[in-house]
């Protein structure tokens, strides 16, 4: 049976996304659920939520992203200015915490926050959101396809006993 909260959230995020981005978001949700089955089955719903919210500010212009950063008190340093396509991770996490508070918690918001850049010592939850965004099935870039094949071929070959090593190796 479909989770009613997730069904409602899917509908709620749709206005924030272009049609293409919505399709990507649903694919990330499916990938996050698949990865949850391997790594964190008890957190599948939370991973689905993070996936559904991860790009809710992606369609905003750089100017709007900077306005949102100011509104939410997000520091924007020189390095960030050089990579404006990563702003949406910070602003989406902040917007999700405010506008989707009934769905989010700190772990979900951190997963959203680090889904583009990653970070040192990522949690398994954060790594799943990051990886799901990159290897979801609608991604056809050569690097995405190669990494998806690498990850799942290793899981198929080695099983889940080495899952932590496989995740770490995939994140490098």
Please annotate each region the language model reported.
Residues 2-34:
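Short, Lys/Arg-rich amphipathic segments at extreme N-termini
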Residues 8-15, 33-34, 38-167:
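Divalent metal-dependent catalytic cores for phosphoryl transfer on phosphate-bearing substrates
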